[in-house]
Amino acid sequence: MPLILEDALLSAADGLVQSGSKIWFHFQKYPWDLACPEQNPGVGEHRRHIETRLTQGLPDPKLAHVLSGTYHLGISPHIYSYYHLLADLLPHLIASQKFPVLVPEFMPNQFIDLLKEAEFEAQVLSPEIFMVERLLIPEMNIPDWNSEKVKLIQYFFEKIVPLKSLPNSQSSNSEKRIYVSRKLAVKRHLSNEDEFLPLLKKHKFSKIYLEHLSVPEQVQLFRSASHVIAAHGAGLTNILFASADVKILEIRPVLTSGQFCFENLFSLGWPRSEHLVPPLSGEFALPLELLDEVLERWQGEPKT
């Protein structure tokens, strides 16, 4: 359930919310009571995130701009990520009564365009302090995914991105083998991509930069995918739109990348998924022999 606060102080730079002696960070993921420290987690990720954030200070009510009315909170430190847009914010907006959504300046324009296309009113806030008359904060589930959330997202995109709705879109029966490159990403890009691309080309894979595609274009691409190979990253969230028999290879820097977030997602409807962890620590490179083994095995498997 969303948390509903009245006269809440909001730091629009990162989404920290304060009401009285209580604060919330990363939507409802990290609550904290300033007046009762004994009730807060003593150790762990929760405490670390809050203590780090508190070094920056709390919102100053003297600097607050007043926002009258009711709003959804759409600001969190990771809301620039496609994964967190779909896992954290969209399910809340879909299931809630429509009010304007407060989003940060750092939210990508294509995310804002998606919200507007879905008839959500997005209000972009500068990184200042605001006093919000009534604020709805999204709930954070553990784990991130469940069957209900998956169906909610899929149904939502079926309405706003119908099949064959885009120019030159492929039919649902077409089969595309795609490799999602993270070469344009700041982190988690495979250092030896140029070495294994010929092997992928041999097996009829196409290299895709999701940064060059709109959200609807990404949805359509994955609807037509028969095989997906990608390093651990937000683009794999698009498996939500792939068929149940798609073959997936997730390449992780370490076994526990993202606290198994995609493994959890794939377990809800995509049984033909697997992962590889490069054997050399400190280097995110994919050995050709490991990739070749997977590709040859896939090649020999009968079509379903």
List where the protein language model places each region.
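The feature primarily captures lumenal catalytic ectodomains
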Residues: 1-304
